[in-house]
Amino acid sequence: MADDDVQALVVDNGSGMCKAGFAGDDAPRAVFPSIVGRPKHPGIMVGMDQKDAYVGDEAQSKRGVLTLKYPIEHGIVTNWDDMEKIWHHTFYNELRVAPEEHPVLLTEAPLNPKANRERMTQIMFETFNVPAMYVNIQAVLSLYASGRTTGCVLDSGDGVSHTVPIYEGYALPHAIVRLDLAGRDLTDYMMKILTERGYSFTTTAEREIVRDIKEKLTYIALDFDQEMKTAAESSGLEKSYELPDGNVLVIGNERFRTPEVLFQPALIGKEASGIHDCTFQTIMKCDVDIRKDLYCNIVLSGGTTMYPGISERMTKELTALAPSTMKIKVVAPPERKYSVWIGGSILSSLSTFQQMWISKAEYDESGPSIVHRKCF
């Protein structure tokens, strides 16, 4: 298979951000939004080299005149043409490599439709002619990155959250809980509650502004009701944010009302369990002998776990659910925003992993369905 001098490429295609780089590196070289933007208006200026589509940061910088679309929703690719554009941009513009010379490791959310995996495999081999590829579950990679082999990973990104129990390196698929509630839903909710304040955010470009406010100013309250009282009584919690046009927006209780949805999905009308409850359900679906090890290794990963106060709140909520004598430890590694990618980088540079790749020859022989046999 792959020679020792050929570096594998690791591509973590999130619903919100695409993280890409070379195996063995300690951080991704390229991190850009998983966005494809198309012009709203026809171009009339001569000499401007207008494209029919822009990807990533370029789309972000021209967002005022583009319609922005995310090809990945809730971890599932909904638009394959745009997805190909993102991969093309990743290989040729960001990493500047020829994909036909490098094995590629891709990631996906657990409990994804099988067709999604097959199509990914097909595009990699047929469109990009990669010599070998592999698809891995995101949460498992996060655990690798934290240096553990046992733990319960809560991975929450822009499109999907899931809790995955892993024991001695084995993921326990029957106990995985998937929650289609993540960063993008929080951004949408924030757009809605800011409307109550009289600020209108409606376009795809304005959604990106709200996402920025969310990333910079929100936090998770340890006691939501208490925090609401405090916010009503004083303006101590208020923060201001300067919009691109120079206007200043003041936000108060929206700062902690937004991420509260993670613990109370009913706030956005979703009939689902909060992230603390999903974690608890996952652990309860596991064998009674391994629960203790899972409770003391709850590992957070993904961008939506970056809110200040999340580990304290998580510990508090789980302590209320778990048996009273149970020791609960929530681990929030500082690099958790990229831990899926880091785990992929570690995994694909291991010598023992080299026989795991799906090679072009195997693909030609069996077709896309080989991905279910070779990739757990």
Curated annotation (Swiss-Prot):
<dbReference type="Pfam" id="PF00022">
    <property type="entry name" value="Actin"/>
</dbReference>
<comment type="similarity">
    <text>Belongs to the actin family.</text>
</comment>
<keyword id="KW-0963">Cytoplasm</keyword>
<dbReference type="InterPro" id="IPR004000">
    <property type="entry name" value="Actin"/>
</dbReference>
<dbReference type="InterPro" id="IPR020902">
    <property type="entry name" value="Actin/actin-like_CS"/>
</dbReference>
<keyword id="KW-0067">ATP-binding</keyword>
<dbReference type="InterPro" id="IPR004001">
    <property type="entry name" value="Actin_CS"/>
</dbReference>
<dbReference type="GO" id="GO:0005737">
    <property type="term" value="C:cytoplasm"/>
</dbReference>
<dbReference type="GO" id="GO:0005524">
    <property type="term" value="F:ATP binding"/>
</dbReference>
<keyword id="KW-0547">Nucleotide-binding</keyword>
<keyword id="KW-0206">Cytoskeleton</keyword>
<dbReference type="InterPro" id="IPR043129">
    <property type="entry name" value="ATPase_NBD"/>
</dbReference>
<dbReference type="GO" id="GO:0005856">
    <property type="term" value="C:cytoskeleton"/>
</dbReference>
<protein>
    <recommendedName>
        <fullName>Actin</fullName>
        <ecNumber>3.6.4.-</ecNumber>
    </recommendedName>
</protein>
<keyword id="KW-0378">Hydrolase</keyword>
<comment type="function">
    <text>Actins are highly conserved proteins that are involved in various types of cell motility and are ubiquitously expressed in all eukaryotic cells.</text>
</comment>
<dbReference type="GO" id="GO:0016787">
    <property type="term" value="F:hydrolase activity"/>
</dbReference>
